[in-house]
């Protein structure tokens, strides 16, 4: 028995023994959930689940997924690079990158998948319940539920007319509204309209412009209708829409310790809001190619202001964040007879997403000197960034890097389920499910030099030096020939004719790095669970699901026309952007199953053991060349021992589980040049988790939930793209291998390392000259390392105290939340270690005895500490910085709610 197993057993036995004493108290309430496609108490289910009623959601101040992650130990949620969101449960989650990658955690609304990024923004308004199912849920929830399910169950209409409104105001000019209204039309038709809106000022100051950003401006609405069709059938309709338009962060900042060779030191983390040393980077090379500089050995960010705090930033522009999402569901419930019922469900969802970030997280103060500094011509022009239908234009006189993400998705799901309720010992849930989704995802990085290279007409040298001869030309082929390859004695028109270069300009969409991914995903499944009462106190569950998944990935990646092999000359000559993808189709089918046995020790105590599996579909890697590079499916199996207990005459709820998770082919992403590669890695995760509710008296309650987990990567090695030879220090100064600094190198304590166009190599190379890298690095053994985003300990402890008076009840709640330090990469490097998180939250609510209103005051993050949320490694092409999200500062406010 390992240490974690002994710890789990000791805690369980000790906890139950300690609280076997009598405590005068009221009884805990059981929560009814639909985790098995039918209504059952949490206490009767042989699986680990935390469920929050509408009252729990309000009490815990769970407004969105980020709040839920604070309340549920081991649940980690954060935004990712691009348009996505990453989730992990129990120390395992979504470590893959790319539009074709499905998450390891299913986020759902009323049982059907909901885009994980959309639901993170929308949050929880007018909900009946939020269920967090931990561990594989492959038999009932399908193709990617390898780590768990987060299911939001929305409130349904009632038979009585009436409504509720809640108003909230707080610091940062917070103004929030939640309301709903029930309107029965007839005895058999009921409707409910819910609405939410939130506005909040920004929490971060841009010291360059003086503007505040990272604000919130969003609203959402939901229409629900239930129609009784006879005595045995009900038709349920739900339509939800959401919109946000603000300047909130996607990725919050960039950490870097500027380094003359690497860009950012791979040895130390550095400070936030710090740009990489641009010498030898992709941007520096293209500054030279674009005739904006006479060398690639120049740091554009030397002398740039650094603000070492999350509360401030130094940006050319504040971020833009826009999202609209719609989700509609039609559900038909029919009682076939006394023993069988049927549920047929169809849902349709759409999403439009856009964001723009200042990707270098700094403002360069070094002007461009030009290819010929002696001319004295200012290097300044008016350039446009973005793409067709989005973006902006501005005066450009120094380095800058912008990021754009544009996404449109639509999906439809259909499901039919048959549920038995027989008097005999055997019952069933049987069903079929289908999914068809389309995801068009565009991700772009654009710099000043790439903007210049797109259209030579905007170059400051065009008229005074070349007499306008550059007009109509553009692209890397032209600029490479003009700057690096042409005889100096020839006039420009003669050079172009001699080289036979075609005349075209580069569309704004492709003036930089662009990865455009059109993903079509189809999934079909049949599933079922059988429940066998072996005796009055023992129950066996057997589940099985067959999935058939197909992912068609049409992907095109270009680094301007410098690396864009499939883009034809005929399209270049049109001056318009075209999509010329490589198509990859990955198909696989898989079985997932579940075996569970549970035994009632008494009416209020149950123990169980289960073995469950789930499979996540394979796909294609988003590499920088757009070539096919598939990855395999991810298969997870978990053995779990647990208990569900209500003790001490109903005053104590104690649920706990010990689990052993084995995953074959877990996706671990690594940066490769401008793209990403998802590696299939084996991993093991052991953990002990649980939650307890204890009434110490009629007016005093303790809530405690926890997770202790140990994760370990299996036998695997990969190249560290930020430190390819595993060096710990430089032993020589950085040396230019050519007069223009296109190729640079230095001696480290692990050998010589070369750099050009941002790429690192252990052998001489020159991407601009057509000489590729022959030795990209030495494999680093990560066997036995801890998984990223897997803190070893996290818990939440709350004290609830009611004060009763003749006029009403005042409830005081104080919560302490803790999460131990964790690693942000598979190398478990010190620079990627995230510090422990500690929060205190409080809420005080008054509710009169003879009225239907309440008033609350609350404070979150009382110590006003801000922590790193997640890490995301930047590409060496940009200098190897570390992107980071960060948590909100202290917030406080007042709430008033009333029903009518």
In which residue ranges do the predicted regions lie?
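Structural signature of Gram-negative outer-membrane beta-barrels, strongest in the C-terminal barrel
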Residues: 228, 418-421, 427-437, 466-467, ...
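C-terminal beta-signal and adjacent terminal beta-strands/loops
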Residues: 439, 445-454, 702, 711, ...
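Gram-negative outer-membrane beta-barrel transporters
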Residues: 536-540, 657-662, 679-826, 895-899
């Amino acid at each position: 028995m390992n240490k974690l197993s002994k710890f789990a057993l000791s805690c369980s036995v000790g906890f139950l023994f300690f609280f076997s004493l009598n405590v005068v108290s009221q009884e805990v309430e059981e929560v009814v959930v639909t985790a098995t496609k039918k209504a059952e108490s949490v206490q009767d289910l042989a699986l680990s689940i935390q469920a929050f009623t509408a009252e729990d959601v309000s009490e815990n101040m769970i407004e969105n997924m980020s709040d839920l992650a604070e309340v549920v130990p081991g649940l980690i949620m954060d935004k990712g690079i691009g348009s996505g969101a990453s989730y992990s449960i129990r120390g395992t989650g979504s470590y893959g990158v790319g539009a074709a990658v499905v998450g390891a955690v299913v986020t759902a609304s009323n049982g059907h998948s909901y885009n994980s990024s959309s639901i993170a923004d929308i949050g929880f308004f007018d909900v009946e319940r939020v269920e967090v199912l931990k561990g594989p849920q492959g038999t009932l929830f399908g193709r990617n539920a390898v780590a768990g399910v987060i299911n939001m169950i929305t409130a349904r209409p009632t038979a009585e007319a009436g409504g509720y409104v809640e108003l909230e105001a707080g610091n940062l000019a917070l103004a929030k509204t939640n309301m709903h209204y029930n309107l029965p039309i007839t005895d058999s038709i009921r409707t409910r309209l819910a609405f939410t809106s939130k506005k909040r000022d920004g929490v971060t100051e841009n010291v360059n412009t003086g503007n505040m950003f990272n604000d919130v401006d969003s609203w959402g609405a939901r229409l629900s209708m239930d129609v009784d069709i006879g005595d045995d059938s009900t038709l349920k309709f739900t339509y939800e829409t959401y919109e946000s338009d603000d300047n909130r962060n996607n990725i919050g900042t960039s950490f870097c310790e500027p380094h003359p060779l690497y860009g950012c030191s791979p040895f130390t983390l550095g400070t936030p809001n710090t740009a990489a040393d641009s010498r030898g980077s992709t941007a520096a090379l293209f500054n030279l190619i674009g005739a904006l500089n006479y060398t690639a050995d120049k740091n554009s960010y030397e002398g740039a202001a650094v603000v070492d705090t999350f509360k401030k930033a130094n940006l050319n522009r504040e971020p833009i964040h826009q999202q609209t999402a719609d989700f509609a569901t039609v559900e038909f419930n029919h009682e076939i007879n006394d023993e069988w019922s049927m549920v047929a469900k169809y849902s349709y969802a759409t999403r439009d997403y856009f964001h723009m970030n200042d990707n270098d997280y700094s403002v360069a103060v070094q002007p461009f000197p030009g290819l010929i500094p002696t001319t004295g011509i200012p290097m300044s022009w008016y350039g446009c960034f973005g793409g067709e239908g989005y973006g902006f234009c501005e005066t450009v006189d120094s380095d800058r890097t912008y990021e754009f993400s544009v996404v449109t998705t639509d999906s439809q799901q259909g499901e039919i389920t048959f549920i038995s309720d027989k008097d005999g010992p055997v019952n069933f849930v049987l069903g079929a499910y289908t999914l068809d989704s389309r995801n068009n995802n565009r991700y772009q990085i654009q710099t000043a030099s790439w903007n210049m290279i797109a259209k030579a007409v905007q170059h400051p040298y065009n008229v005074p030096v070349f007499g306008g001869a550059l007009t109509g030309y553009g692209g890397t082929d032209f600029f490479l020939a003009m700057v690096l390859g042409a005889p100096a004695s020839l006039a420009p028109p003669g050079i172009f004719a001699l080289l036979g270069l075609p005349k075209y300009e580069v569309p704004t969409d492709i003036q930089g790095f662009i990865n455009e991914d059109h993903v079509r995903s189809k999934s079909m499944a049949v599933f079922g669970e059988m429940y066998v009462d072996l005796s009055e106190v023992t129950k066996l569950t057997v589940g099985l699901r067959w999935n058939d998944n197909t992912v068609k990935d049409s992907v095109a990646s270009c680094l301007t026309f410098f690396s864009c092999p499939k883009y034809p000359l005929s399209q270049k000559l049109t001056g318009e952007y075209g999509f010329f993808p490589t198509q990859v189709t990955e198909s696989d089918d898989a079985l997932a199953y579940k075996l569970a046995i549970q035994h009632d020790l008494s009416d209020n105590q149950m123990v169980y053991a289960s073995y469950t599996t789930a499979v996540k579909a394979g796909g294609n890697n988003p590499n920088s060349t757009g070539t096919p590079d598939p990855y395999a499916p991810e298969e997870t199996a978990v053995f779990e021992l647990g208990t569900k207990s209500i003790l001490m005459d109903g005053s104590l709820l104690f649920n706990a589980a010990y689990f052993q998770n084995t995953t074959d082919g877990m996706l671990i992403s690594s940066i490769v040049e401008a793209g990403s590669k998802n590696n299939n890695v084996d991993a093991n995760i052991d953990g002990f988790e649980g939650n307890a509710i204890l009434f110490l008296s009629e007016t005093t309650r303790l809530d405690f939930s926890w997770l202790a987990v140990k994760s370990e990567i299996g036998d695997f090695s990969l190249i560290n793209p930020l430190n390819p030879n595993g060096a710990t220090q430089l032993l020589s100064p950085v040396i230019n291998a050519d007069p223009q600094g296109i190729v640079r190198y230095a001696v480290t304590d692990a050998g010589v390392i070369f750099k050009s166009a941002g790429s690192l190599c252990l052998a001489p190379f020159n991407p601009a000259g057509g000489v590729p890298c022959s030795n990209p690095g030495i494999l680093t053994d990560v066997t036995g390392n801890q998984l990223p985003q897997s803190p070893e300990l996290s818990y939440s402890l709350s004290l609830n105290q009611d004060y009763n008076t003749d006029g009403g009840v005042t409830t005081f709640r104080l919560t302490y939340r803790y999460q131990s330090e964790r690693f942000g990469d598979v190398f478990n490097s010190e620079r990627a270690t995230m510090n422990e998180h500690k929060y205190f939250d409080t809420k005080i609510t008054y509710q009169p005895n003879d009225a239907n209103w309440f008033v609350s005051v609350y404070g979150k993050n009382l110590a006003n500490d801000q922590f790193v949320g997640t890490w995301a490694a930047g590409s060496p092409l940009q200098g190897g910085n570390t992107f980071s999200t960060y948590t909100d500062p202290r917030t406080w406010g007042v709430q008033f709610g009333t029903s009518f």
